[in-house]
Amino acid sequence: MSGGYLLDTNIALFAAAAPEMLSRAVRNALKNGPNVLSVIAFWEVVLKSSKGKLDVGDPLEWWENSLNDLAATSLPFRPAHVAAIRGLANIHQDPFDRALIAQAMVEGFTLLTSDELIPKYASARFRVIG
């Protein structure tokens, strides 16, 4: 798999609730696709929802609606993704973002994010649009 756009959790959340918060570059990428949502984003939403830090209603319904609304496919978290985390610099301590970075590297995706730390990882191994 390669050549698509992997959405950071914040992009998936903004796309549904406040698309005006997204940069023009991100909005254009979302229109052009193909778009991919990682189960890592779903996991992050479930955990934040269960702690009362995020209200998306039913997280499973949010996930299914997000896949549909963004015309996105679901990306599982595989052993190759886990292994790629080991080689990442310690720039970012967020385990969800580190997992998404690893997935972008392994799969050849461009990562869509508004996180200011993630572009510091960008290299010839993956691209970032923010």
Regions found by a protein language model. Give the residues of each.
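Short, well-structured N-terminal submotif of metal-dependent ribonuclease cores
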Residues: 1-38, 52-65, 107, 116, ...
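Acidic, PIN/NYN-like endoribonuclease modules and their adjacent C-terminal/linker elements
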Residues: 101-130
